C-alpha cells in the first residue's frame, strides 16, 4: 500500500518536527517508510538546498527552476521507486511550496510553475497534504527563538509571508479531498495527535498513490 503524504506550511509551523513524529508512529505500526524533504532528498538536491537557502539572491525564475530541478531528481530517483515498492513516503515540503513561495510570494505565473512540475515529475501529486497553519508573526518568532539557521526566505518582508500563507489557505479550500489543515499554534504533542488522526482517517478511506 503506497501513500504519498506531504507537510506544508509557513515558516516556523513545525513541519520537520511533525513529519518525524508521524514517521515514528507509522514505524511503530509496522509500515515501511521513506522520510525525505525538499529541497533535498538526493545529493544534488542537498547541494541545491544549501545554495538556495543560504546563497545570494536569485531571480525568481532561476529560483523556481532550481527547486524544480532538485525535485525532478528527487521524484525519479527516490519517491517514485518507493511508491512502486508499496512504501509510504513522507515529504517535508513538495511542489505546493514552489506554488506558494515562488508563485504567490515571488509573483511567478502559477500555470507556468504547474507545467514545470508536470514535465519534471510526470505530474506526481501527493495523496494527502497536511497544512500546518500558524500566523506569520508567530512562525517567524518561533524561528528566531529556536535560534534556527536563518535563511533568505526567513528574511523576506512580512507581506511576502502573508501571501504565502494566503495561498496555502486558498489551496486547501479548493481541494479539501487532498488537503487537511491542522492548527499548529497548539503544543507539539497535540498537533501530533491531530496529524495522526488525520492520516489514519484518510488511509482508512482508501485513497492511494497511482
Swiss-Prot record:
Keywords, ordered alphabetically: ATP-binding, Kinase, Nucleotide biosynthesis, Nucleotide-binding, Transferase
GO MF annotation terms: ATP binding; dTMP kinase activity
Top enzyme category: transferase
Any Pfam family hit: Thymidylate_kin
Homology family: Belongs to the thymidylate kinase family.
Catalysed reaction equations from the record: dTMP + ATP = dTDP + ADP
Phylogenetic placement of the source organism: Bacteria, Pseudomonadati, Thermomicrobiota, Thermomicrobia, Thermomicrobiales
Native organism: Thermomicrobium roseum (strain ATCC 27502 / DSM 5159 / P-2)
One Gene Ontology biological process: dTTP biosynthetic process
Name of the molecule in the record: Thymidylate kinase
Entry binding sites for ATP: 9-16
Keyword Transmembrane helix: no
NCBIfam families in UniProt: DTMP_kinase
Role played: Phosphorylation of dTMP to form dTDP in both de novo and salvage pathways of dTTP synthesis.
Keyword presence, Hydrolase: no
Enzyme Commission code(s) on record: 2.7.4.9
GO CC, one annotated term: cytosol
Amino acid at each position: 500500500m503506497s501513500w504519498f503524504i506531504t507537510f506544508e506550511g509557513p515558516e516556523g509551523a513545525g513541519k520537520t518536527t511533525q513529519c518525524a513524529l508521524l514517521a515514528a508512529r507509522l514505524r511503530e505500526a509496522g509500515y515501511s517508510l521513506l522520510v525525505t524533504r525538499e529541497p533535498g532528498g538526493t545529493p544534488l538536491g542537498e547541494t541545491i538546498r544549501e545554495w538556495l537557502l543560504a546563497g545570494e539572491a536569485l531571480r525568481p525564475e532561476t529560483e523556481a527552476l532550481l527547486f524544480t530541478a532538485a525535485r525532478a531528481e528527487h521524484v525519479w530517483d527516490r519517491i517514485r521507486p518507493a511508491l512502486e515498492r508499496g512504501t509510504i513516503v513522507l515529504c517535508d515540503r513538495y511542489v505546493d511550496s514552489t506554488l506558494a513561495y515562488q508563485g504567490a510570494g515571488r509573483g511567478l505565473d502559477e500555470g507556468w510553475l504547474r507545467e514545470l512540475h508536470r514535465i519534471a515529475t510526470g505530474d506526481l501529486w501527493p495523496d494527502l497534504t497536511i497544512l500546518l497553519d500558524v500566523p506569520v508573526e508567530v512562525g517567524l518568532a518561533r524561528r528566531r527563538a529556536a535560534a534556527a539557521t536563518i535563511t533568505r526566505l526567513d528574511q523576506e518582508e512580512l507581506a511576502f509571508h502573508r501571501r504565502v500563507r494566503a495561498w496555502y489557505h486558498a489551496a486547501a479550500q479548493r481541494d479539501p479531498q487532498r488537503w487537511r489543515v491542522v492548527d499548529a499554534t497548539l503544543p507539539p504533542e497535540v498537533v501530533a495527535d491531530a496529524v495522526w488522526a488525520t492520516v489514519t482517517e484518510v488511509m482508512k478511506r482508501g485513497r492511494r498513490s497511482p
